[in-house]
C-alpha cells in the first residue's frame, strides 16, 4: 500500500463462502493500524458477525446479492463501512440480547457492540443500510496531531 492509499473497497457476493476472504482483509487492515493481535482478531469477529447478519437478515440468505466493504484508515481510528442493498433495517430494533437470554446464533450484535468503539446504522441510502464501525487507535489518539476524521498516510 503506498502513502496515498487511505481507503480500501471490497465488493463480495452475499455468500458465506467469501467470509474467510473478508476476515483476511479485515485482519490485515487492523495490522496496518498497528492494533494488537487480539484487537485485530476482535475487529475481524465483529465484521464477520455483521456480514453474517446482513446475509441472514437483510438478504434472507439470498447468496446472489452484493455487500460493499469500505475500509478507511485514519490516524486516530479505523472505520469499516458495510453496505447492503437489502431490506431496510430499523436501528431501534437492533438490540443485543442479554447474556441470560442467549440462544444459538444470538450473540452477533452483542459482540459487535462490545468490540467496536462506535456502531452506527445509516439508513439514508435509497436501498439498504450502511453499518459504520469504528475502532480507535488508543496509542495514537492521545498524541495525534490530526483531528478526528482527518486521514493519515500509511507506509
Give, region by region, the residue ranges found by the protein language model.
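Conserved short strand/loop->alpha-helix "switch" segment adjacent to the catalytic nucleotide/phosphoryl-transfer site
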Residues: 20, 26-48, 101-103
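Charged, alpha-helix-enriched surfaces in structured cytosolic catalytic cores
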Residues: 17, 38, 107-110
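STAS-typified acidic loop motif
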Residues: 9-21
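Conserved beta-strand-loop-beta-strand hairpin that lines the nucleotide-binding pocket
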Residues: 1-9, 54-155
